[in-house]
Regions:
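Active-site-proximal loop/hinge segments that shape catalytic or ion-binding/gating pockets
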Residues: 1-159
Length: 159
């Protein structure tokens, strides 16, 4: 099993240097980045004490990725594949839907996300994700995830 995180390809250089960091850590360490989230999402994250968590998807598809491109927060996106070992980290949290949703159930039980039928269920990893758990696309092309020799193409024209 893999988990996924979308990002603007322009962020890949800093991710390769520092790992995948929460937006709060990026700001605290003054690391330039192109966020996929908007100000409202970050405000809700902060209110729910989730600003220091990296949000991961259960599948390489998420309406927020498409919306971020449509709203021009990012130019395009690539999917990073994250080893599921992060699930067992003591501080990892799980949400049955997008963690910023009012009705979201967020706790430390992996089944909260893994058993959820909601395609926006999330795994929330505190702080940052070490490089050893991140698989990068073999070629940096917008909207492409290379996994197990198969290519999943997200057509940016549809955004």
């Amino acid at each position: 099993m893999q988990l996924y995180h979308f990002t603007d390809p322009r962020n890949l250089e800093s991710i390769r240097l520092f790992g995948l960091m929460s937006w709060q850590q990026l700001i605290q360490q003054d690391i330039g980045h192109f966020p996929g989230s908007d100000k409202d999402s970050r405000r809700i994250d902060a209110r729910k004490c989730l600003g220091n968590y990296v949000h991961l998807c259960l599948r390489p598809e998420h309406s927020m990725a498409e919306l971020a491109v449509k709203q021009k927060r990012i130019e395009s996106f690539v999917w990073l594949s994250i080893d599921c070992s992060v699930i067992s980290l003591e501080t990892t949290q799980f949400s049955d839907q997008n963690a910023t949703a009012r009705a979201a159930i967020i706790n430390h039980d992996p089944q909260t996300a893994l058993a959820s039928k909601n395609p926006r269920a999330e795994v929330l990893v505190e702080g940052s994700i070490d490089l050893r758990w991140i698989s990068f696309p073999s070629e940096v092309q917008p909207g492409i995830l290379v996994k197990n020799d198969s290519i999943n193409i997200v057509d940016p024209i549809t955004f």
